[in-house]
Amino acid sequence: SLQTNDGGLIEGDEPEQPEEPGDAIFSESFANGIGSFTTADIAGEQAWNADDQYKCMKMSAYADGTSVKNEDWLISPAIDLSKARTLTFEQAFGPYNKSMDNASQLYTVWVSNNYSGDVSTATWTQVTINYPAESGWAFSDAQATLPAIGAQAHLAFKYKNADGDETLTWEIKNVAVK
């Protein structure tokens, strides 16, 4: 309730309640394919694709028995990041028992406030996410703090690999921004 200057109450004028922490402003499960995301294939023949069996998006640079050079982006539609938000998603890496030492350089999450369809002309900022200790195909929860960069921001999952480097498959599902 609000008070008038003479101390009287004004009924019915309740202040706006803040958003509940559990309310997602954006979500995409990938259960039915790529959804509202798009892809950008910068290098290599491989690309992000929907996995109908595991209900996720996945990317691998493994082809014809070897790891090949790739750079591929999985990009969200515009998301309101006019204030800091929390990103959550599930991720899995394969094959089994591979090192995750270089994960933070190869399997990364980025945000941009000026992406307009070409990843090479946008300014991207990497956000820190958590990774499992080793690969093993099991989905685990990942989380990141997304900075306040504007009402028309884009989120991207970037997969990178060099020729001959040991590569992992990266699977992503149940993306949410809260």
Stretches found by the model and what they are:
Residues 30, 76, 81, 85-97, ...:
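Extracellular beta-strand-rich recognition modules
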Residues 60-66, 75-79, 129-133, 142-146:
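Beta-strand-rich interaction surfaces with strong enrichment in secreted/lumenal proteins
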Residues 20-69, 140:
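Extracellular glycan-recognition surfaces and repeat-rich motifs
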Residues 33-36, 113-118, 162-164:
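Acidic glycine-/aspartate-rich tracts in secreted/extracellular proteins
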Residues 128-178:
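Terminal, low-complexity interaction segments
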Residues 90-128:
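Extracellular ligand-binding interfaces
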Residues 65-66, 96-103, 164-166:
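Short consensus segments that form the blades of beta-propeller domains
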Residues 2-21:
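Ser/Thr/Gly/Pro-rich low-complexity, disordered linker/stalk segments of secreted
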